[in-house]
């Protein structure tokens, strides 16, 4: 398995200045595979807001829920190129990975796998017995990645 350093990136903790770029990455990466987009296609904009607005708000919720569960991927040039969000329900013994995304030119390099492994290691260190990640059926890339790591469809 490649390390982040060999790929030319650094994994670091989330900083408040990352919020807007992470939202932009999210909206771009989730086009075609977002439940919010599917809902908009079925029902139109909801309450006057498009799916991109709703999806970006998921990042606000992730930051509010567990800011320490966010890892950011930064290129050697200091550009944020991807991220993962996670949170832990220690009472239930479950860790959640709600969002994982990269800018297009950084996809397919194994970084998503590395981020998920880091998060799963954190979950295990916290004594969690299960992890949950969700995706739509049309997200072939996500399905392949998640099952190759050991997630099972339920």
What are these regions (language model features)?
Residues 7, 13-17, 24-99, 103-105, ...:
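Acetyl-CoA-dependent GNAT
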Residues 107, 133-143:
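Conserved beta-strand-loop-alpha-helix junction that forms the acyl-donor binding cleft
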Residues 1-8:
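Acyl-donor-binding surface of acyltransferase catalytic domains
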Residues 110:
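Conserved G/P- and acidic residue-centered "switch" motifs that form tight phosphate/ATP-binding loops
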Residues 123-134:
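Conserved GNAT acetyl-CoA-binding A-motif
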Residues 132-135, 147, 152-154:
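Conserved catalytic-core motifs of GNAT/GCN5-like acyltransferases
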Residues 25, 126, 148-149:
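Structural motif
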Residues 113:
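Residues forming the Rossmann-fold NAD(P)(H) cofactor-binding site
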């Amino acid at each position: 398995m490649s390390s982040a350093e060999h790929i030319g990136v650094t994994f670091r903790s989330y900083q408040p200045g990352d919020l807007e770029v992470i939202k932009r990455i999210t909206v771009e990466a989730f086009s075609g595979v977002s439940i919010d987009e599917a809902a908009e296609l079925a029902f139109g904009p909801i309450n006057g807001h498009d799916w991109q607005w709703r999806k970006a708000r998921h990042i606000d919720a992730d930051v509010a829920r567990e800011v320490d569960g966010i890892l950011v991927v930064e290129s050697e040039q200091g550009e944020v190129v991807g991220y993962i969000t996670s949170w832990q329900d220690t009472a239930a013994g479950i860790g959640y990975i709600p969002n994982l995304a990269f800018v297009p030119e950084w996809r397919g390099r194994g970084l998503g796998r590395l981020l998920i492994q880091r998060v799963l290691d954190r979950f295990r260190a916290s004594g969690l017995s299960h992890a949950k990640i969700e995706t739509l059926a049309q997200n072939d890339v996500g399905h392949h990645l998640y099952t190759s790591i050991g997630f099972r469809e339920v």
